[in-house]
Regions:
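A charged, aromatic-enriched C-terminal amphipathic alpha-helix characteristic of glycosyltransferases
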Residues: 350-377
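A conserved catalytic-core segment of Leloir-type glycosyltransferases
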Residues: 43-103
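Carbohydrate-associated surface elements
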Residues: 192, 211-212
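Nucleotide-sugar donor phosphate/pyrophosphate-binding loop at the beta->alpha transition
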Residues: 146, 151-153, 160-178, 215
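Nucleotide-activated donor-binding/catalytic signature segment of Leloir-type glycosyltransferases, i.e.
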Residues: 264, 272-296
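Conserved catalytic-core segment of nucleotide-activated headgroup transferases in glycan assembly
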Residues: 215-216, 226-275
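Acidic donor-binding loop of glycosyltransferase active sites
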Residues: 300-316
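Membrane-proximal helix-turn-helix segments that form the acceptor-binding/catalytic region
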Residues: 23, 103-106, 130, 169-188
């Protein structure tokens, strides 16, 4: 089967959508399919030609973004007035135009028109939404008399207009509906997100296809030893939907020794200021790591006594790190700001994991997930 994957991020980036695109491409190539990855971001100094040979896939680069691995574009402005003006400008730009959505999606469509050969299945990964809009524009330009031979699948983790993180102008609702009309299916990771998509696309076109990983070649540490409670968090923090400050405030009240390892993808100035404040108070009890490669991360997580998951305050997203947590086979305490229970946390600190979260990882096996996509063709 001839398969194309359109994605903004790919290996070696440490991002859930990069993991998804990479695992799908690698597994489909392993199964003998002809795989082409259309990639919007180029990491400086990375050898994509060598990666193509290793995976037996084709990588077609679209030069929309070029950056260093782990780098994040952060605007630094010390003047409070200019900082407020910049924030207002960015907010208006995002609310009314969604940044460079229209310009970049048009460029994506043009690149696809020039480079896309006949495919049996095309999977476009959202985040950013311009992937979906770009492919929809490409499909819309196809001649009306073209025989339908390709199955187009939009893969999304969070709706664009109905996002609980970002407010946008009303017309984006109709743009999103127009986009989904050009896809045969919309795949989302969890059924909890269906109500958010129901106003945008017929229910029968929505398919539940979760995040996926290769679980066959995972190296885990032996059972953890040592008397000092050691626990970890991996992923990202946000100021709004996943703010960790309440947890750090509790940790500062504990008299006993512990080690809390925090694994983050990149440095965010707002989150860094929070971490720095509490690292001064907690000292060696708080250990912060950045940009740790996934296989190394899994091993490090498996060395801990237990793991913690700070849940989103949104209902449409399922953190992909929960799959990684399940792979490590370590107990997981999951909570948010409102459900955090100091007594349960204390029980975990003393080896009582009766309230551990149950994570069934079989549905997230890459072999299962790749078949779910193939079955749609």
């Amino acid at each position: 089967m001839r398969i194309a994957i359109l994605t903004a991020v790919f290996h070696p980036e440490l991002h859930p959508r990069a993991f998804r695109a990479y695992e799908l491409a690698k597994e489909y190539a392993k199964q003998g399919h002809e795989v082409e990855v259309f990639l919007l971001t180029r990491i400086q100094g990375f050898d994509y030609e060598q990666l193509s040979k290793e995976l037996d896939i084709k990588i077609t680069l679209f030069p929309l973004y070029t950056r260093e691995l782990g780098a994040q574009n952060v605007f630094q402005q010390t003047n409070p007035i200019l900082r407020w003006v910049h924030w207002g400008y960015r907010w208006l730009l995002e609310y009314f135009l969604a940044g460079n959505l229209f310009a970049y999606s048009t460029r994506i469509a043009e690149h696809l028109k020039q480079t896309m050969k006949e495919k049996d299945m095309v999977i476009a990964l959202s985040t950013p939404f311009m992937d979906l809009l770009g492919l929809a524009k490409y499909v819309h330009q196809l001649p009306n008399n073209t025989e339908k031979k390709t199955t187009y699948i939009a893969d999304s983790g969070d709706p664009f207009y109905y996002s609980q993180q970002t407010k946008r102008a009303l017309y984006f609702k109709w743009i999103e509906k127009w986009v989904y009309r050009h896809f045969d299916y919309l795949s989302i990771p969890t059924s909890d997100a269906i109500p958010a998509y129901a106003p945008l696309i017929p229910i029968e076109k929505i398919k539940i296809i979760p995040q996926a990983f290769n679980m066959r070649d995972v190296n885990l540490a032996p059972a953890p030893t040592g008397n000092i409670p050691t626990f970890a968090y991996a992923g990202v923090f946000y100021q709004d939907i996943r703010n960790p400050e309440f947890l750090f405030q509790h940790l500062c009240t504990l008299k006993e020794d512990f080690r809390f390892h925090v694994y983050l993808r990149h440095r965010d100035p707002h989150i860094t200021s929070i971490l720095n404040k509490y690292q001064q108070q907690l000292g060696e009890k708080l250990v912060i790591h950045y940009s740790v490669e996934r296989t190394e991360l899994l091993y490090s997580l498996s060395e801990c006594h237990f793991l913690i998951n700070i849940s989103n305050t949104t209902t449409t997203q399922l953190p992909s790190k929960l799959i990684d947590y399940g792979i490590t086979k370590r107990p997981v305490y999951s909570f948010d700001k409102h459900s955090f229970d100091p007594l349960v946390f204390d029980a975990f600190m003393h080896g009582d994991y009766t309230r551990a979260m149950e994570i069934e990882i079989r549905p997230y096996d890459i072999e299962v997930v790749t078949k779910q996509f193939i079955d749609l063709v």
